[in-house]
Amino acid sequence: MTLDISKYPTLALADKPEDLRLLPKETLTQLCDELRTYLLNSVSQSSGHLASGLGTVELTVALHYVYNTPFDQLVWDVGHQAYPHKILTGRRDRLSTIRQKDGLHPFPWREESEYDTLSVGHSSTSISAALGMAISAKKEGKNRKVVSVIGDGAITAGMAFEAMNHAGDIHNDMLVILNDNEMSISENVGALNNHLAQVLSGSLYTSIREGGKKVLSGVPPIKELVRRTEEHLKGMVVPGTMFEELGFNYIGPVDGHDVNELIKTLKNMRDLKGPQFLHIMTKKGKGYEPAEKDPIGYHGVPKFDPAHSSLPKSTSSKPTFSKIFGDFLCDMAAQDPKLMAITPAMREGSGMVRFSKEYPKQYFDVAIAEQHAVTLATGMAIAGDKPIVAIYSTFLQRGYDQLIHDVAIMDLPVMFAIDRAGLVGADGQTHQGAFDLSFMRCIPNMVIMAPSDENECRQMLYTGHQHTGPSAVRYPRGNGMGTEIQSEFTALEIGKGRIVRESKKAKDGSKVAILSFGTFLESALQTADAIDATVADMRFVKPLDEALIKQLAADHDVLVTIEENAIAGGAGAGVIEFLMQEKLLMPVLNLGLPDKFIAQGTQDELHEELGLDAKGIEKSISDYLAK
């Protein structure tokens, strides 16, 4: 539903940045107010990421006001905070479609707009990309400005510091803006810092500082005195000199909600030479009190009524797989003090809030540091503990070398609880958990499990925790099937599946067996009822139940594998590899995710589109048998 733009008269004048730059400066505060209200009213009707964007309204307006976008390049890290950017770059009337099938992409996306310089979704990539753009801008000699905007969470990742270390070394012109919403700043401190920012970024101070460095460079004691004096001056209000040690000229912190002061500072910094670092303080959820009080809860929101002070609760009586995992952690920790749970900044999403409160000494949030998370688990395992790394499928990609080098080679008892495996829905290409089976299946020593329901998930987590080597349990986003959950733990026999439905002779004379890996089992059973097929819940992707595969191959004419993973290199590919190794030549149909990046949509919409619901599975099998 598109909002009535006549209710936002100043915003109506700023459809694109070139329109924005024509507005008088005295109207920009009103523009920010209208932009924030528009964002709140739109996202509350459509769902999406809210709190981050509410906090970056003034920054977004200031950036597009000062810089000549899209010629000058803005690089947004992750992109949760880029909704105001989308509104101001010609996509205002489509904001209500964001994160929906065929709608606006949830993050900045190059195919969507010339103002989106980098397609993003994972964190901490912006400084590296911006530096690459800055290097090329210098090469082409067109005086193109490049700006990276990164949050205080994303900047903790090693990749961000690697990029800053390189930028400081080669001294290219670029600006990194740290959007720090961890704390609020008082009016006095904010005013003092805003004034200091004007001084430190101004041309007079810059020329004096650079000139003084040249004059005094041959007099080490005086040079050191000047340096220390400058640091003491800045140290009164600047939180440290770490960024300057990396080679950046640090300015800030400044109030990120004063649009006119931001514009002054950005104009001063725009033409400074070398790598610049602007530290701004913002409030996540700014302007909407419930989001200010609960920025985590309002980070990503369903449809809601802004007039109410709370978000609607889920109406499903079925637990999510994330909750199944969280309950397992608490129940298992009560029995095993050696259990250690690690997450790279995904406490809420991974279902670990309760565990973090009940077992704080066994809980470790390492921030956005997937590589460190995996190798931290390595150290714990070497010391005799039983670590569990709770991680989204898409983010495990970032710790792949550590999975091989630091865990699997040493055959250490580290379990990976892989959430959001398969299609996650609204977050699109960057977040679909499409590849974990493919990239883990080739690793020696790994045990890989794919539960068909929530009870099987619980027992597989226990199985992995008891295993003496590396293991992984991968499960999807969302609710379970409503299966009864047994409270007691039962370890599964590793590498053993089960037949859950036996077929009789099919109507066309061909006997079909469906080998289901994961939560498609319910759809497989619906299909089997329609075509009279055998169904096996394979449970283990590695090691495969080779005896069961041999049995199914001997008793059936066609095998069908189904998984919520890329077909290339996935579980079905493993079945074919085994059959070929045993010289068991027979027709095998692999169903799963196609060889393309899957865009956003609801999980049900995507399953239907890809032919992975019961109706689509039946059609694929019928078409295959008809060949």
Curated annotation (Swiss-Prot):
Keywords: Isoprene biosynthesis, Magnesium, Metal-binding, Thiamine biosynthesis, Thiamine pyrophosphate, Transferase. GO terms for biological process: 1-deoxy-D-xylulose 5-phosphate biosynthetic process; isopentenyl diphosphate biosynthetic process, methylerythritol 4-phosphate pathway; terpenoid biosynthetic process; thiamine biosynthetic process. It comes from Vibrio atlanticus (strain LGP32). PANTHER family: 1-D-DEOXYXYLULOSE 5-PHOSPHATE SYNTHASE-RELATED, 1-DEOXY-D-XYLULOSE-5-PHOSPHATE SYNTHASE, CHLOROPLASTIC. Belongs to the transketolase family. DXPS subfamily. The lineage of its organism: Bacteria, Pseudomonadati, Pseudomonadota, Gammaproteobacteria, Vibrionales. GO terms for cellular component: cytosol. This is 1-deoxy-D-xylulose-5-phosphate synthase. Mg(2+) binds at residues 152, 181. NCBIfam families: dxs, PRK05444.2-2. Binds 1 Mg(2+) ion per subunit. Binds 1 thiamine pyrophosphate per subunit. Homodimer. Pathway: Metabolic intermediate biosynthesis; 1-deoxy-D-xylulose 5-phosphate biosynthesis; 1-deoxy-D-xylulose 5-phosphate from D-glyceraldehyde 3-phosphate and pyruvate: step 1/1. The keyword Magnesium applies. GO terms for molecular function: 1-deoxy-D-xylulose-5-phosphate synthase activity; magnesium ion binding; thiamine pyrophosphate binding.
